[in-house]
UniProtKB/Swiss-Prot annotation:
Protein name: Uncharacterized protein MJ0725
Database matches in PANTHER family: 7-HYDROXYMETHYL CHLOROPHYLL A REDUCTASE, CHLOROPLASTIC
Pfam family membership, one: FrhB_FdhB_N
Recorded family membership: Belongs to the FrhB family.
GO molecular-function term, one example from the UniProt record: oxidoreductase activity, acting on CH or CH2 groups, with an iron-sulfur protein as acceptor
Amino acid sequence: MKYLSAKSKLNIDAQDGGFTTTLLSYCLENGILDAVVVVGDKNWKPVAYLATTPTELLKSTKSKYSISPNNKLLEYATENYDKVGLVGLPCHILGGLQFDLTLKVGLFCTKNFYYDTIKSIIKERFGVNIDEVAKMNITKGKFVVETLKKKGFAGTEKVVYEIPIKEIEKLCNLGCRVCTDFSAKYADVSVGSVGSEDGWNTVIVRNKMVEDIINEMAEKGLIEVKETVDIKAIEKLENIKKKNEEINKCSAYFAVCPALF
């Protein structure tokens, strides 16, 4: 296992460093994958879909902090394509183990919310309608929402709202309260922002296949890579999630896990 910081050199409007989109684009363009399950959105409500080209990936570049039933598409995908990838949270990756997948990309996750809940939080705490949101993030212990307000005749101004995540964590999905996996340990590669500087992704490389792909991407100038990850920051969040083992009841977990909806 190897920890890296990575950033795309492509012009991608991504959540952080654009690594995941660049990785998937490379895999689709070079025959490593035929299709990949990713998540777009309709007014920030997650919509899982199957992407077969780099262009189709562009609708999936931002984080959505609401439940998405990604794995519903896996049966169709694996029946119709030979080399299938999955991008998802730790619970999606766990559920995806029952399928023959070529590449599993796991995303760091502390907690997730139902769509109506996140919509209400944004409206009640910030006075913002969901359709005004330009970006959401959970970072450094805070839930952060960005909007773009009109300024002048043709300009816009970014407005940032934030609250401590502790103030809303009790509103999260029930399955998140017993989940013990922060970094998607069953994935081939795990991606997030914790442990890297702003504008970069933290990448946990979990097998040689992914290591070889990343080396190829770096050699071709598609990504910039460095080994300056704050591993302790990742381990801190992993340990917090592991505390859920004390209350974890397997039957309850699989009953409410969003990957199995």
